[in-house]
Amino acid sequence: MKYNKKILKNGLTVITSEMPSFESATALVMVGAGSRYENKKNNGISHFLEHMAFKGTKSRPTFMEVAGVVDGIGGEFNAFTNKEYTGYYIKAGKNNIEISLDLLSDMLQNPLLDAVEIEKEKGVIIEEINLYEDTPMRKIADIYESLLYGDTPLGWDIAGEKDIIRSITRKDFVSYFDSLYSSSNMTVVLAGGIEREAAEKLVEKYFVNMKPFKTPKPPKIKENQKVPKTLVRHKKTEQAHLALGVRTVPLDSPERYPLFVLASLLGGGMSSRLFSEVREKRGLAYYVKAASDQYTDAGSLVITAGVDPKRAEEAVEVIISELKNLTSGKKKIKAPELKKAKEMIKGHMVLELEDSRSVSIFYATQTVLREEVLNPDQVLKKIDRVTERDVMKVAKKYLSDKTLNLAMIGDFKDKKKFERLLKL
């Protein structure tokens, strides 16, 4: 699944990925504008702006007119906000790609940002925040990253805080939009049943008037953790949720591939080490999984689990014991286990990329965040090349007491009982 890259005169990057057997096509616009570009006064505005983009343009002044365009072609449209980017996409029949580009370009060049709609949408955003607060399985990731990155934009919640959301004005939106929504800070990806040259001409037609300008860079993370840290959020829940992890590497590090395999080996499937020990052997958790996450200047290997609150300490002990068993060599990585961990990653990736939307996100995130853009085959080969020695090297290097972090949500008032467990 190859791609073509073209940069227009206004600095806009265009990626096309032809998938000849597909009857559908996705048009995605990704902007290098996420919550880590915010400050204390406008935290949450990246996500809020994503909502407002659908609320009307100069030529389509209402949400119903915007939505009607997509409904009229039987498509789906949505958007998503990350800490480092925001994406807007429409997926529809391949013959409707021009309609998709027309609408997306209109939304991102001519948003009304109507003051009345802003006030109305504040209620929606606040209820979304409430939803996250009442969903501890999701909220635990936010708490974990606040522990890792502290009082910095990378440590703040993407949705923001309610009081800040209530205070945001139209002027704030215009200022934020005008500082980051530049053609030179944008990537358009077209994936699916498209023809490259025709698709590139359509992008140029609808985005040619966008202006390039220099955009600000977010503050870099300075990591100097030397002791383990714990953060416990007290909440009366039937199930406790934990995130236990260590600091690792940023997005461009070659070590990220061994870390992907390490995460897969530990908690990538139902036969993984942690699933076997924590759930199957001891019945401590409903879910337990591991992931390796990266930003442009930071990264983390994190294990998450939903556990019986009365046995939460035992669950943490078992997880840490498994990490020790790995780094000490007590439980060696054998060839079949390594192969299975790699095949798990590869299989999930292949299945995910059967969808043109996933393909568009795959290329867009790389283009916005990285110097190098790889196609799926290149990524799969990098996973294949990971050896047992590579995995053990990153395990011993990063699974350390000094950068160990534990976040928990549950009916706990004393974090000291968990702090004493954080020894690798």
Language model region names:
Residues 26-91, 268-284, 295:
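M16/MPP (pitrilysin/insulinase) zinc-metallopeptidase core fold and M16-derived inactive scaffolds
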Residues 15, 21-23:
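N-terminal glycine-rich anion-binding loops that anchor highly charged ligand groups
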Residues 2, 7, 18, 65-215, ...:
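Charge-rich, well-structured scaffold segments of protease-associated domains
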Residues 227-238, 245, 254:
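Phosphate/diphosphate-binding glycine-rich loops and adjacent basic-rich segments that engage nucleotide
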Residues 251-252, 256-270, 274:
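A conserved active-site cap/scaffold subdomain adjacent to cofactor or substrate pockets
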Residues 27-31, 104, 240-242:
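A short acidic-to-branched-hydrophobic micro-motif
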Residues 18-19, 53:
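Short clusters of small/polar residues that mark proteolytic maturation junctions
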